[in-house]
Structure formats: C-alpha cells, structure tokens
C-alpha cells in the first residue's frame, strides 16, 4: 500500500539523460526541493512545480533561477487568478519562460472537477500559456490504499473539451500498460491511444483557431 517513490535524484537524472539522448526531445521533470533545481536543470529543459508545492516560494524561485522554463501546476484549492504571484516569482528569479497547468479543483473529498473557464482566466491573470493536465485531472486522491485512484475513461473527453475551450498545450501521462506503471497507474492513458487522441485534438484545435476571436489556442 502507498504510493511508489522514484529512483532518487541521481538515478532519475541518469534515466532522463538517456531518454533525451535516445529521442532528441525536450525533457520535463518535477522538482520537490530547492536543492534539486540546479541539478535537474543540467539535464532537463523544463522544471515542473507540483500542484501541492505551487505556493512554496523558495522552490519556485530556485526553479526560476536556473534560467530554464518553469511549468507551475495550479493547486487544487486555488483560483486561476491566484497563480499570478507564483508566475511573478519565477519570472523575477530568471526563468526563461513560465507556463501554468490546470489539473482540476477539489470537489469535496477524493474528487476533482475541471472548470473549463480556467484557461482564459489563467492567461488573463498571468499573461502566460495555460496548459491542461488531462491525466491528473481524473485522479481520485487517496482512494487506493493510500495512493491516488482515478477515472481514466474520462481522459479523452476532458482533453477534447480543454482544447475546445482554448488551452495552449497538453500534459498527458502515458504508459504501454498503465496497470503495470509504478505510479499513477489508475490515471494514465494507454500509449496506443495517445497518437489517435492527439490526431483528433489537432483537428479540433484547427477548427477552434479558425473561428477564434483571439482567445485561446
């Protein structure tokens, strides 16, 4: 019981470096303590502040001070407008860029809902891109023997809705066999379904952009 832990900072960064070398893709990882930021910035392109830590000033400033892009997840208890302070701190510290990610709002105990107005409100309040986390938004916090449960069947519909509502990007956790993933197994999208879903939402995004009045993607 309980949530799985990662391999540790050194081993984790080695694995990320291997992924970057093999794929040539930009890398993103969470950081949980200020002391981790400079080390992680040697390997990854984007430092991500977890939602529960988005008000930790020392962490946000340390991430920004690396000069990397900083993605800050909105706390599940926070209004979109409240993210402006965290964005300002990351910018002032020297971040190359900042984004804010919507990942749902507490709706009672052990449940999250997504307010699709959040993307426009985040942009208006912060002036930075608003990202949608389509997988953590279906979490059921603390519902699986001390770890998070989830409702992954809702991932595709929420992703489609977020693109229609004008989000600027997507964060999606995926795995070839989610049931075998050491963490977040109950709120991942199977890898085989990722490509078709992205094809679908890119078409949707084009439709939204063609009729956009300047709000959103």
Segment roles from a protein language model:
Residues 24-33, 45-58, 69-80, 98-104:
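Catalytic beta/alpha-barrel core
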Residues 1-10, 174-188:
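Glycine-rich, proline-tolerant flexible connector loops at the mouths of alpha/beta enzymes
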Residues 11, 53-58, 82-85, 114-115:
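Active-site glycine-rich loop that binds ribose-phosphate moieties when present
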Residues 1-48, 56-59:
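N-terminal active-site wall of soluble small-molecule enzyme domains
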Residues 66-174:
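Catalytic alpha/beta core domains of metabolic enzymes, predominantly
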Residues 177-210:
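C-terminal helical cap(s) of enzyme catalytic domains, especially alpha/beta-barrels
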Residues 1-7, 26-30, 50-51, 108-109, ...:
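Active-site mouth loops of central-metabolism enzymes
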Residues 14-21, 64, 87-91, 120-124, ...:
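Surface-exposed amphipathic alpha-helices with a cationic face
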